[in-house]
From Swiss-Prot:
A GO term for molecular function: potassium ion binding
Binding-site residues, substrate: 37, 227, 252-253, 285
Function per UniProt: Key regulatory enzyme of the glycolytic pathway that catalyzes the final step of glycolysis, converting ADP and phosphoenolpyruvate (PEP) to ATP and pyruvate by essentially irreversible transphosphorylation.
Location of the protein in the cell: Cytoplasm, Cytosol
GO cellular component: cytosol
Annotated disulfide bonds: none
Source species, domain of life: Eukaryota
NCBIfam families reported for this sequence: PRK05826.1, PRK06354.1, pyruv_kin
Protein name from the UniProt record: Probable pyruvate kinase, cytosolic isozyme
Cofactor(s) listed: Mg(2+); K(+)
Family stated for the protein in its record: Belongs to the pyruvate kinase family.
């Protein structure tokens, strides 16, 4: 896929049974995948390890970078097991008892749920949703002594084993990081040098402080992405965003907790706030859901993806479409095409003005230079921006101002003695930039013996050659470079040789 067709918006793919072989992962990388999501709600460590090894092999084979995201299971509430393991038929108007004794095998009269405080936390008149909201149970009475809740079924449906449960409007007394999550992060995530953790059911800013404490020295190299999936999280959104490195709009559980007709607004407001803080945001859940079975998305899905791009999302995400669908590669290609089309309609000048309007005054020197570089690129009709960076923060600030052209983020190693220690100083910032719209990271090996000025010239030359190779610019084009030399930071307009 030629580089000009790759959208600026990044695509996150969930790897699963349909997409974990080396050839398939290679296809997804070529089609436009930038981040691979490992969903720890399912699968053993061995299973995920095999998938990760295959991903790394595919990255080597294609020479493409891909970030690794661990998505935690979080404090889920589930229904229990059923007699003989057979689904039960629930009829509208039928009454049923919910027990909090999880050893109970359920039937048509009694089922169990994994949340011990259910009888204390719900009140008559409230609704309990099961199996992604396909079953709605109205609470009639609660027996706190026995830990049981009497409900009436609001609709007719089949209930299988271990289905997810939502309690709209209830402040659930469960930790954001369960013991399983801690184990997943420390025993699988950290040793495998993952790039980011998507935290399920974040409810307040202090949740993130605890996770950083848990990560210790690794907190520097692992980004924390918050998923707000209930009313408490929505209420504390600003506090959560300040404490997060990135954000995911997980519309699935959110759609159970807040009225479905308000989801569009929640999405727009959250993206808007993330954009102004320069924090990357992922829009997720059911984006091309019908492509699990069909080679074409519905018109509504195509419009949904395009609208997320117009709203300002940095990434769009595929879940079941790539994990278990019949057309994983086609889903990514379709998504990329829709993103390219949506991006071509944006008024980048207007977006720049809007972000400048909301920028803090006074701006930090670095941010002031980043926004000036974007303005320079626009007025000089440059086709590419090149940012030389070590930790990646300069390139990320440039991306915040949303130039209409790609930003080549050239990650230069920090020289420690004579060896280049890529692992600690470099690959992480390059992969982290894979969740920012418009950033194209590239690793530059550089020559250890050159002086600062020579090495800057060499790096710029390398960057323009790379840009030409990837069809981001051509001979005679203007490009704007932003780099540090000595104590000065320089914005330079170059002509591609």
């Amino acid at each position: 896929m030629a580089m000009e067709q790759r959208p600026k918006t990044k695509i996150v793919c969930t790897l699963g049974p349909a997409s974990r072989s080396v050839p398939m992962v290679e296809k997804l990388l070529m089609a436009g995948m930038s981040v691979a999501r490992f969903n720890f709600s399912h699968g053993s460590y061995e299973y995920h390890q095999e998938t990760l090894d295959n991903l790394r092999q595919a990255m080597l084979n294609t020479g493409m970078l891909c970030a690794v995201m661990l998505d935690t299971k979080g404090p889920e509430i589930r229904t229990g097991f059923l007699k003989d393991g057979k689904p039960i038929q629930l009829k509208q108007g039928q009454e049923i008892t919910i027990s909090t004794d999880y050893d109970l095998k359920g039937d048509e009269k009694t089922i169990c749920m994994s949340y011990k405080k259910l009888a204390q936390d719900v009140n008559p008149g409230m609704v309990i949703l099961c199996a992604d909201g396909t079953i709605s149970l109205k609470v009639l009475s609660c027996d706190k002594e026995k830990g049981t809740v009497r409900c009436r079924c609001e609709n007719t449906s089949m209930l299988g084993e271990r289905k997810n449960v939502n309690l709209p409007g209830v402040v659930v007394d469960l930790p954001t990081l369960t013991e399983k999550d801690k184990q997943d992060i420390l025993e699988w995530g950290v040793p495998n040098q993952i790039d980011m953790i998507a935290l399920s059911f974040v409810r307040k800013g202090s949740d993130l402080v605890q996770v950083r404490k848990l990560l210790g020295k690794h907190a520097k190299t692992i980004l924390l992405m918050s998923k707000v999936e209930n009313q408490e999280g929505v209420a504390n959104f600003d506090d959560i965003l300040i404490n997060s490195d990135a954000f995911m709009i997980a519309r699935g559980d959110l759609g159970m907790e807040i009225p479905i007709e308000k989801i569009f607004l929640a999405q727009k407001v959250m993206i808007y706030k993330c954009n102004f803080m320069g924090k990357p945001v992922v829009t997720a859940t059911q984006m091309l859901e019908s492509m699990i079975k069909s080679p074409r998305p519905t018109r509504a899905e195509a419009t949904d993806v395009a609208n997320a791009v117009l709203d300002g999302t940095d990434c769009v995400m595929l879940s079941g479409e790539t994990a278990a669908g019949a057309y994983p590669e086609l889903a990514v290609r379709t998504m990329a095409k829709i993103c390219v089309e949506a991006e071509s309609t944006l008024d980048y000048g207007d977006i720049f003005k809007r972000i400048m309007l909301h920028a803090a005054v006074p701006m930090s020197p670095m941010e002031s230079l980043a926004s000036s570089a974007v303005r320079t690129a626009t007025s000089s009709r440059a086709t590419l921006m090149m940012v030389l960076t070590r930790g990646g923060s300069t390139a990320r600030l440039v991306a915040k101002y949303r130039p209409g052209i790609p930003i080549l983020s050239v990650v230069v190693p920090e020289i420690t003695s004579d060896s280049f220690d890529w692992a600690c100083s470099n690959e992480a910032p390059a992969r982290h930039s894979l969740i920012y719209r418009g950033l194209v990271p590239v690793l530059y090996a550089g020559s250890a013996r050159a002086s600062i000025d020579e090495s800057t010239e060499e790096t710029l030359e390398f960057a323009s050659e790379y840009g030409k190779k990837k069809q981001l610019c051509k001979t005679g084009d203007s490009v704007v470079a932003l780099f540090r030399t000595g104590n000065a930071i320089v914005i330079k307009i170059l002509t591609v040789k």
